[in-house]
Amino acid sequence: MCLANRLSENNRVLLLEAGGADTSPFIKMPTGVIRLLSSRTENWAFDTAPEPALNNRKINWPRGKVLGGSSSINGLVYVRGHAQDYERWRQLGNEGWSYEEVLPYFKRSMNNERGEGPFHGIGGPLNVKECESSLPTHQHFIEASIEAGYSFNPDFNGAEQEGVGPFQVTQVARKRCSAADAFLTPIIDRDNLNVAILGRTLRNDIDGKKAVGVTYKQDGNQIQEVASKEVLVCAGKVQSPQLLQLSGIGNPVHLNNVDVECLHPLDGVGQNLQDHLNIVV
């Protein structure tokens, strides 16, 4: 959504979304997350492979299938990646991706109701505010954690991320502020922006070493679009590597096993996934 916003300032952009429009009232209301996590309309509702350490149970893995992606169905918590992760990306050769270098873009994208500071910005499209839901048990949990040796942290997006404390959320007043709300809705009427909902990308079309277009399915029809400049894959941590594999980019052995011609061998595609666990107490 953010890329569609920025790129359509000067370019013609086709935005493909496999899901539908974000019109469900459950998306707008924060407590609607309970309904969305069990939805099969706005949620891909994946299951993991059986986990040996969990008695071979499969763990439900919600992913957004709607405009705004997972930002339209998540718990609204605003916590950035750890600074050391970005620094690791830079060390691997991704120049420009250290935390110091990406922090200005985080600040530019947000309107933090705490005000402007070294780690927060104001005036941006994504509204971030304090979580208004507070119960006595919340404070009891914080106090118990401090007694157990954890430090109190009033800002997980500040100088330190470790510790215990209240988190901020992506809301405007008492409504969700998703990526679609922040970056897409304000520019939806641009003539050079085409948003195709219910358009599931089947593959990127590759010519030599370059992606030259996409093939997607919409309303039962298979459609091929040719890109005049470039193709950007923004399908999330699960379906971005899946889309690369469907396009012939990945481990040759795996692609051969699922009858996909390998156009570019790259063993790391679909590997090294890390995700956070959520435990409701």
Features from the language model and the residues they span:
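N-terminal redox-cofactor-binding region of secreted/periplasmic oxidoreductases
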Residues: 1-281
